[in-house]
Regions:
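Glycine-rich phosphate/diphosphate-binding loop of Rossmann-like nucleotide-binding domains
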Residues: 10-45, 151-248
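A short helix->loop->beta-strand "cap" motif at the edges of active sites that frequently abuts
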Residues: 36, 89-93, 113-115, 189, ...
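Short acidic-hydrophobic, aromatic-tinged amphipathic segments that line or gate anion-handling sites
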Residues: 60-65, 118, 226-231
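An N-terminal-biased, well-structured beta-alpha scaffold segment characteristic
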Residues: 2-109
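Adenosine-phosphate binding glycine-rich loop
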Residues: 121-123, 127-162, 274, 279-380
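Rossmann-like adenosine-cofactor binding region
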Residues: 201-303
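Short glycine-/small-residue-rich Rossmann-like dinucleotide-binding loops
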Residues: 73, 79-80, 98-99, 250-254, ...
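Glycine/serine-rich phosphate-binding loop and adjoining beta1-alpha1 elements at the start
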Residues: 2-5, 10-13, 83-167, 310-312
Length: 380
């Protein structure tokens, strides 16, 4: 059996990213043979009040960030940036959220450096028949919905518990929407509707305290999108404008993105309305959509709407997010470190390999980036 070493990065090149991949409190719980293959970045647990000396008995050792990225067989780094990938070399494995489909430069670096990318975003528990069961990081997705709503309400100076009664509509119904609804309810916003493409009766595990509504969308023409209400079919944009808070939790198909609102639509919104874009894909969902940062988390659309689009919002609740992500990752430490044969034997890992030794495995990368299907995957 192959025995790879794991370099666990504690700092991030991404602005204000504070999550760790493994929670310091979980390291003592790992099997001894796994701990012997784990090297941490210096000061790994400092933000959690845990010194290196306290973690030393539970890992092989410590190294600098640069050394770990350059020498580890497997680099565990949740939010890799271009500079991180550029510092890696042929044969290494990057395990994190590379989001290569929409990142042409990172993809090119991975091809050129002949890297293997195991993508958190593609790690799912699969049923025996091969169908989708549950996303491995579904709790992180819930925290994304929760954190985005929490942070956006803070920035807008709003709560549903005091002041004018607020109403909200959440677009989509997955883990992020569940987290968004949890945050809205926790902060006194009880008039909440959830829009889903499925028939309301076909939604599994609905949240019983919210109103579920079906909507249908005409690609390329938001004017023809409708919500089915007790009054009949209503135009989507007008329906959204009746609410104080709109939360977008849609998992977009990059080959066929949906747009729910254009800048012309915001004039119908009440002044001070809030659009919380948990999905925050550039140009998708809303015509003006773009990811924002913790340093500059919102901007105004028209004269009426505040738009929030921080695309790594779980970092707002970094301690809780680290705990959930660590719990999700730990079962996969052993198969990842046992190498390619173990990856191939585990559907969660084999189906999450986006690029393998510089070869593109995920066809969505080719389609979205307009690349040739043959190596070296030239842009066409």
């Amino acid at each position: 059996v192959t025995s790879l070493g794991l370099g666990v990065i504690g700092s991030s090149s991404m602005e204000n990213e504070r999550r760790l991949p493994l929670h310091p409190d979980h390291l003592p719980l790992l099997d001894a043979d796994l701990r012997a293959r784990i090297t941490l970045e210096h000061d790994y647990g400092a933000r959690f009040g845990v010194a290196d000396a306290a973690l030393a008995p539970f890992v092989a050792g410590f190294a600098s960030r640069e050394e770990l990225i350059a020498t580890s067989d497997v680099v565990l780094l949740p939010k890799p940036q271009l500079t991180d990938v550029a510092a890696m070399h042929s044969g290494q494995v990057l395990w994190g959220w590379p989001h290569c489909v929409q990142d042409r430069e990172l993809t090119q670096l991975a091809i050129d450096q002949k890297l293997t990318l195991i993508a958190f975003e593609a790690m799912n528990h699969w049923r025996r028949d091969g169908s989708f069961g549950l996303h491995v990081f579904h709790k992180n997705n819930e925290i994304a919905g929760y954190s985005s709503v929490l942070h956006a309400l803070e920035l807008a100076g709003l709560t549903g518990d005091y002041g004018r009664r607020l109403s909200a509509v959440v677009i989509g119904f997955g883990a992020t929407a569940r987290g968004a609804v949890t945050a809205l309810k926790a902060h006194g916003v009880h008039d909440v509707a959830v829009l889903t493409h499925r028939e309301v009766a076909a939604v599994s595990s609905p949240i019983h305290s919210v109103l579920m509504r079906q909507f249908d969308h005409t690609p390329g023409d938001p004017e023809l999108s409708h919500v089915i209400t007790e009054r009949g079919r209503e135009p989507l944009a007008a329906y959204l404008a009746e609410n104080d808070i709109v939360v977008n939790c849609t998992l977009q198909d990059t080959a066929n993105p949906l747009v729910y609102l254009t800048e012309d639509d915001v004039t119908a919104f009440r002044r001070g309305s809030l659009v919380v874009d948990v999905s925050c894909d550039r140009g998708m969902g809303f015509s003006w959509a773009r990811p924002t940062t913790f340093d500059d988390p919102t901007f105004t659309v028209g004269d009426t709407v505040t738009y929030y689009g921080v695309d790594h919002s779980p970092s707002h609740l970094w301690n809780s997010a680290t705990w959930e992500n660590s719990n999700a990752l730990i079962p996969f430490l052993r198969p990842v470190l046992e190498g390619p044969e173990a990856w191939d034997a585990d559907p969660t890992l084999s189906r999450a390999i986006e690029i393998r030794d510089g070869r593109i495995i995920n066809p969505a990368i080719l389609a979205f980036q307009g690349r040739s299907p043959a190596e070296p995957y030239a842009l066409v």
